[in-house]
Amino acid sequence: VFGIGVLAALAFTSVAMVESPSPVRAEPSQCNEFPEGQGSETVEGYYQPAEIERVVQQLEHTGQGVNTDVIGTSNQGRPIYSVRVGSGDKVVFLQAGIHANEPTGTIALVNVLKSLSDSSRRSQQVREAVTIVAVPQLNPDGAVPYQRENHQTWDDTVAMFPQLAGAPSAFYHSLPGPRFWSDPRVPGFDLNRDFNPDFDYAPQAGHLPGGGSVRGMYLTPEARASRDLYTELEQEFGLVDVFVDLHNQAPCNTFDDGEAHTPDLHTPMSISAQFLRDPGSHGAGTAYPNFGWDASRRANVAAWEGVQRGGSTFSGVTRYPQNLDLAGSANATYQLRGSASVLMEAGRQRHANPQWRHGFIAKVHELAMMGIIDSLVDNTFEDIDPYRYEEIPVRNG
């Protein structure tokens, strides 16, 4: 949420080949408990870091127009991979797994990469028009214990930045134990609070502990790896056209369809272009003159339309609650620097068949990503009215 023994059949299924399940409404039995025998969500069916390495190697060896790289290492020394597909003038940066207990974006991203690197004519057109740069799993250390945070003690952090000795720990560092939004097994940082649009920022003790509406400090090697990749893309392309961050949200979020006497409908995904309550106070239009507000709204509309192409099964995409103020998020940081920034929060479907559940969520992510990519390939992106963003219904709660 913005605030692994893999299923091989899902991991290597193209965007077009995932079977559409039946329409889903928000039923109490689905929302209040898992089906009998399912228990809570587990790591089964999701990628472990070693499996990501094998997938990346397979993409490089069998895909067309694919290049891979290690953009950094996690705090525990695991490689963080990027996959590049295509050579077009427009660049799309896709990122998954920043919160490692929200893992279906990784499945979806692998599916999209497999599809776009195949020999079909459409994939060739995409590769000629667009450069896709993807980080399938930004937080490999969190994937091992299946937690939101990375694995990094405050002592680890002070060892990296001795100037922080004696200062309080950052507000987004957690010790093991239940939280409202998480239940870390090992100490670590919420990576999606560690970003800062000032790429030259150096951590300062006087800025600790910080708070939710202030910028991050790049205390984690994972956030720095994402920043460094983005910097390289800026240097190559001048502007990173689109940035997408893939997340999961709680199951059975709903929205009001506007019809009287009908129950609220279940939303398969919530999306957002809004990450700062007062962008100007963070330098939008001044220090960051390319602030991508209109472009972000266009990209969200393209994602919305992409999911609608999946038919009624995937109807009901909503806007994430529009009161975010998360200056330390990747979305806010890259939007300030000029990218069309999109948050995608697909719901964790609770269904008796785990393959159905994972496949449904991954498919929603895939359709949304391809909606954006197709609009760039077909040169319709700039024709999208950004004010249509307001037509997307807002999620309840």
Functional labels for PLM-detected ranges:
Residues 69, 74, 81-86, 109-111:
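Zymogen propeptides
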Residues 70, 81-83, 91-95, 133-136, ...:
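Structural recognition of the beta-strand scaffold that forms the well-ordered cores
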Residues 84-86, 181-184, 199, 333-339:
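Short glycine/proline-enriched loop/turn "hinge" motifs that connect secondary-structure elements
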Residues 87-116, 295, 299:
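Enzymes and membrane/adaptor proteins characterized by extended Gly/Ser/Thr/Asp/Glu-rich
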